[in-house]
A protein has these predicted regions:
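NAD(P)H-dependent oxidoreductase Rossmann-fold/reductase module
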Residues: 1-4, 15, 19, 23-28, ...
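Fungal eukaryote-biased detector of long internal structured cores
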Residues: 1-125
């Protein structure tokens, strides 16, 4: 049965969470895929020049989209501005709404009777996620002119560092099961926490950037040309773009463990799995290089032939041990900031609901 939720409205997220907890016995996986670009326009001279002179790079990592700083959501509660802090619109739609939803349905994800082992939290990121756009002191991206890229870089960091010892206190808090109303079954031991994965759909032809019909089909033509020129990321169709997320959601845990094994054997960790396709459109999930994390967190050059042969972002360099330590420390700070923000907003929502109840 389909459900509707506004991820920019935390009360809507809370309401959906309650419905799911009351009507479903468990969740094997939750795919966190919704996006708000926040763009207000295109720098057309820059776009035309970039596509004409540097097609593959510009339609993979575009530099011509325009976004304002300081976009915020509508008020979440009736508590007033003196009690309710600002909440970044792109941050809430792309990260925080998902984050709150996943925490709220943790009883379903931690159900002991799971088909493929522990439940799965699958973050859908973007090829455009770049750590340089993320400022941990501006975790909501209110001051940046690249709020979309900032929010997706935050998704990357949360997923890739979730199993590190340095983030464990805050990740454990996120995975905790809040007290549920009604009788609770007693269990001999705490159920296992979910596994967290990261993916992206490649470059698809969607309406996330509103364009007129002639421009939309011109965009698709540019995507096709980029694929023919060797881009591994132009899946174009949303069906092909779903390849990696669906693989993560439906594969047996042993299959996913085997896929990550070469990276872990070489000192790495979690992998960003992207939907990729060849010139003929045959899709497959592959490892994606991440700024500050490299290929699966492995220091040095890529360890798999497929990764070494795949086209890289211009300017990409092999991961160093120092960069990896910085990324892990950034993960610790981001997890701490997100958990503090979640707890703050849960308290505000509790207060708002109590206020409404007292007036009823």
């Amino acid at each position: 049965v389909p459900e509707n939720v506004d991820l920019s409205n935390l009360l809507s997220v809370r309401a959906l969470s309650r419905r799911l907890n009351q009507t479903l016995p468990k969740l094997d996986a939750i795919v966190l895929n919704a996006g708000l670009g926040g763009w207000t326009g295109i720098n057309w001279p820059k776009a035309i020049w970039g596509v004409m002179t540097d097609l593959v790079h510009e339609v993979s990592w575009p530099s011509f989209k325009i976004a304002p700083a300081g976009m915020v959501t509508d008020p979440q509660t009736a508590l007033g501005d003196d009690k309710e802090p600002r909440l970044g619109a792109v941050f809430c739609a792309n990260v925080f709404g998902h984050y709150m939803l996943a925490h709220n349905v943790m009883p379903l994800l931690r159900h002991p009777d799971q088909l493929h082992g522990p439940g799965r939290v699958i973050w859908v990121s973007s090829l455009e996620a770049t750590v340089k756009y993320l400022d941990v002191d501006d975790i909501q991206g209110l001051r940046t002119l690249a709020p979309y890229e900032s929010s997706k870089a935050l998704s990357d960091i949360l997923a890739l560092t979730a199993d590190l010892p340095s983030t464990a206190p805050w990740v454990k808090s996120f995975y905790s099961v809040d007290e549920q109303p009604g009788p609770q079954e007693e269990t001999e031991q705490e159920p296992p926490h979910p596994n967290m994965f990261l993916t992206h759909p490649g470059i698809c032809g969607t309406g996330i950037l509103p364009l007129s019909w002639p421009l939309f089909y011109s965009m698709l033509a540019a995507f096709w040309l980029a694929r023919l020129l060797g881009s591994p990321w132009h899946t174009i169709s949303t069906y092909a773009g779903a390849c990696a997320p669906v693989w993560l959601a439906l594969s047996a845990q042993a299959v996913l463990d085997d896929a990550e094994a070469p990276y872990r054997r070489n000192g790495g960790g979690r992998v960003k799995w992207g939907s990729s396709c060849n010139r003929l459109g045959h899709d497959q999930p592959v490892c994606t290089e991440v700024d500050g994390w490299g290929y699966g967190g492995v220091v040095g050059p890529a360890v798999l032939d497929g990764d070494r042969c795949r086209r890289r972002k211009r300017g990409a360099v092999d991961l160093t041990a120092e960069e990896k330590l910085q990324y892990e420390d950034l993960g610790r700070k981001c997890w701490q900031g997100m958990e503090e923000l979640r707890i703050q907003w849960d308290e505000l929502l509790d207060e708002a609901e109590a206020q409404v109840g007292s007036k009823a």
